[in-house]
Amino acid sequence: MRYPEASSPLSSRQVREELGGADAVIVALDELDAAAISAGRNLKVIAKHGVGVDNIDVGRAALGGITVVNAPGMNSTAVADLVMGLLLALQRKIVDAHNSLLEGRWERFHGPELVDRTMAILGFGRIGHEVAKRAHGFGMRVIAYDPFLAPAEFERAGVERCEEIDAALAEADVVTLHLPSTGTGPLLGGEAIGRMKPGAVLVNAARGDLVDEDAVVAALRDGALAGYAADAFAVEPPVGRPLLTAPNVVFTPHIGAFTDHANELMGMSVVEDILAVLSGRAPRHPVIIKD
């Protein structure tokens, strides 16, 4: 067993150097492209310590007879907690107030309350449901968009269903993203951001490429967007990106799933599935390629 020590995700080259004769590999945000997978001459199973597999070439793995597994549902509460933390930090200017106090100032920072405001959740899966519970606890009205869910699912959660993304954007004071990568470019580009309610804020704790970060910067600077909070970025780490110097932002380094409880659940899940594959049994959480 090898456990590379690194402060940031490993590149494809670094992964290739580490794989050697490994039968299994567990990755978080490390890059497993076709070249890295091909370097794993004995590789039988790739386990994602998380849910999204956009950093893994699942198609190349399938061609090589390599099983890919993930850990769905294990980090839902952890991510939902962080979403609300980011939102509160953004709205109540907690980071600005903290930094101001450390610099010796005693400033009063004003911001909106969440009660009676409307949150739009784009992508109403496990995490979206958990975010809705927390938003309801703050007295928010919650609307959601998810084309793959039956209307009854929204009703059970006490959430209003939006049939189109644009309808959700136009109504919401807060928009939070919980969708997989589109693979075809940003879901929210300049035009979509322009259709958001004036003074709205955007939270992205899903995938960095869901938003056009340059469009976000422009909207923040001209005041069309009141704030942006993110735990995911188009390039990670986002060193030197214009987004980092934009006004009214709060960021975390992709730590949505990083709680003790979530890490334990995900770790146990992927280890159990690795052992299943290596012993010839079917894993509980295989990643299936959709046509």
Residue ranges and their predicted role:
Residues 64-66, 72-118, 130-137, 283:
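Phosphate-binding beta-alpha-beta segment of Rossmann-like dinucleotide-binding domains, i.e.
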Residues 2, 143, 209:
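Conserved beta-strand positions in the Rossmann-like core of class I SAM-dependent methyltransferases
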Residues 124-125:
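Glycine-rich Rossmann-fold phosphate-binding loop(s) that bind the pyrophosphate
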Residues 4-5, 49-50, 66-77, 146, ...:
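Short beta->alpha connector loops at strand-helix junctions that form conserved
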Residues 1-69, 170, 189, 194:
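An N-terminal-biased, well-structured beta-alpha scaffold segment characteristic
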Residues 68, 199-291:
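Rossmann-like dinucleotide-binding domain for NAD(H)/NADP(H)
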Residues 34-37, 147-242:
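Rossmann-like adenosine-cofactor binding region
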